[in-house]
Swiss-Prot record:
EC number: 3.4.17.-
Active site, UniProt feature: 322 (proton donor/acceptor)
Binding site for Zn(2+): 136, 139, 224
Protein name, as recorded: Carboxypeptidase 2
InterPro entries, alphabetized: Peptidase_M14
Family: Belongs to the peptidase M14 family.
Signal peptide interval: 1-21
Gene (name only): MCPB
Pfam family, one: Peptidase_M14
Organism: Trichophyton rubrum
Record carries keyword Glycoprotein: yes
Keywords per UniProt: Carboxypeptidase, Glycoprotein, Hydrolase, Protease, Secreted, Signal, Virulence
Length: 538
């Protein structure tokens, strides 16, 4: 098995508890529960009543949960809970996806609607909301918060009815059932499911993305957990104080109006709702490398291989919602799950309370993006600013604001841009590229005639290989020069028009300079001096 050291070293989710080499199954992290002094800073919240199997049926909790070798809720327990809710509530429909995990496990999901709509035939003038958890199998508060949300909706019929007046909701609690079974971050094949959204290496990724594209949501959330015990400072005696870290989608090819809606309405409301629940939050970050002695934290990035940005590039509002939980087994599980629940409910309530603004802004953003002739962004940078970040002293549990350098992506700054093509031309010898685009929800027309005429071509001027493996490949940084030429392509070539909602996913995949492009991952291999085999129409 490949040791994905580059991935594990930079990942906040794994942090200092990373697995340095992988085997088949049970790639579990060591458990380091909070000592008593730290645990005292994360007490149970008075009045909390969570309606999901881990809390209402404690006898169903797996024995390994207490020592960090399993999650709390088995597949069959989760499925039974969901089925019972669906039988008792006409507006809840239990479904099993028409595909299986890599080891043959099911994907149950709930479709919530006050009408007779479906994934294939959604309600008109309603928001479509996609909620998912369990992408990483060792982050149990992610899927549990989705189950608690379902339980809350069933117990609060008036609130559910108010939501469903304005939206249809699809809840996929467990994105990675094999990872949950092994209590590991990865898929069964040891690919990271949250790094496969562009290259689409695994069929499971493709299947779920096709369901997502079919539903075509206006709003989505992705529920995760982050490492609890990552220590900082000269004495390694302080840790993140937050219960919750969150981030909107940041890629600059998402319509600016949609990004502004995410930051100025949803993010502000989410922070207030977390505080109102007696919890603490900060923006989602990863640890950066700095030449100075000052701690550098990087705000959630713009890379499209991450689910948050990949979903956002379909022109929707997306939030990554992370709770403090990796590495501490069952400790503070009620508080962790509550943190996820508060964030998910905040997104739903904000959308309903501001329905006209939210619906109209997203729909206008989709139209504006679809008809835009503005340049597209291929690479960007994160300006460094000074700010503070909430920390907790592990010796006395005191809370304090620690000064840091902060690489911000709110917003990122464009570095390399290029004119937006009217369409891409793909030769018939690349049907696998077209299939990937179709998984994204991008439409491609197969031409019954030869194409003869002018195109924009990209001549490769530089290819630089990374120094390490990344999920089994050596990624590349590609530079090109745009030239004009005439070309003859045979019948069966593909025309991918860019006046479509999901075209931004084609931009990041097909423009070679993008960090997550098909060229970067070797799906379309290129070398210096080559002419890139995908062509642009002005």
């Amino acid at each position: 098995m490949v040791a994905y050291r580059f991935l594990t070293l930079i990942s906040l989710g794994l942090g200092s508890h990373c697995v340095s080499a992988l085997q088949y199954g049970y790639n579990q992290l060591s458990t380091h529960k909070d000592p008593a002094v730290v645990a005292g800073a994360f007490p149970a919240i008075n009045g909390t009543h969570l309606r999901s199997p881990a809390f209402t049926s404690p006898g169903t909790v797996s024995r390994g949960f207490s020592d960090g070798t399993s999650g709390p809720t088995r597949d069959e327990t989760m499925e039974g809970f969901m089925r019972r809710l669906a039988r008792s509530n006409s507006w809840m429909a239990y479904h099993e996806a028409g595909f299986k995990s890599e080891e043959g496990r099911k994907f149950p999901y709930m479709y919530l609607s006050a009408s007779s709509s479906s994934v294939e035939n959604p309600s008109s003038r309603k928001l479509r909301v996609w909620l998912q958890g369990g992408v990483h199998g060792n982050e149990p508060a992610g899927d549990q918060s989705m189950l608690v949300l379902l339980g809350d909706l069933a117990a609060n019929q008036k609130w559910a009815a108010k939501l469903l007046e304005k939206m249809d909701i699809l809840v996929l609690p467990r994105y990675n059932p094999d990872g949950v079974f092994y209590f590991q971050r990865y898929l069964a094949t040891n690919f990271d499911p949250n790094r496969d959204h562009l290259k689409l290496a695994r069929q499971q990724t493709r299947d779920i993305k096709e369901l997502f594209a079919k539903f075509s949501p206006h709003i989505a959330t992705d529920m995760h957990e982050f490492t609890a015990g990552r220590a900082f400072g000269p004495k390694k005696d302080f840790i993140y104080a937050a219960d919750a870290l969150f981030s909107a989608a940041k890629n600059l090819n998402i319509d600016e109006g949609i990004r502004q809606l995410s930051e100025k309405l949803f993010a502000k409301r989410m922070g207030k709702d977390i505080e109102a629940a007696g919890l603490r939050w900060d923006p989602y970050i990863t640890l950066g490398e700095s030449s100075s002695s000052k701690l550098l934290l990087r705000e959630a990035g713009t890379d499209a291989k991450i689910g948050r940005n990949a979903m956002g590039l379909s022109q929707c509002v997306v939030f990554l919602c992370e709770t403090r939980g990796i590495g501490i087994a069952d400790q503070h599980f009620e508080r962790r799950t509550l943190s996820g629940l508060v964030m998910a409910k905040s997104v739903l309530q904000t959308a309903v309370d501001n329905f006209d603004e939210v619906y109209n802004t997203i729909e206008r953003g989709i139209r504006r993006f679809t008809n835009s002739r503005n340049d597209i962004v291929l690479t960007d940078k994160s300006p460094i600013i000074e700010r503070t970040f909430g920390m907790l002293n592990t010796t006395d549990a005191s809370l304090f604001d620690y000064p840091i350098d902060f690489a911000t992506t709110t917003p990122a700054e464009p570095v390399l841009t290029r004119s937006r093509p009217r369409a891409y031309l793909i030769p018939p010898s690349w049907p696998d590229i077209v299939k990937r685009l179709e998984v994204f929800g991008v439409k491609a027309d197969k031409l019954p005639y030869s194409y003869v005429g002018p195109v924009e071509a990209l001549n490769v001027t530089s290819v630089t290989f990374d120094k390490e493996f990344y999920e089994g490949v050596v990624t590349t940084t590609v530079e090109t020069k745009l030239v004009e030429r005439s070309i003859r392509l045979p019948p069966g070539s593909y025309l991918v028009k860019t006046n479509q909602k999901n075209a931004a996913l084609a931009f990041v995949a097909l423009e070679p300079e993008n960090i997550d492009s098909f060229a970067s991952f070797g799906i379309i291999p290129v070398n210096t001096g080559d002419q890139y085999p995908i062509f642009r129409l002005k």
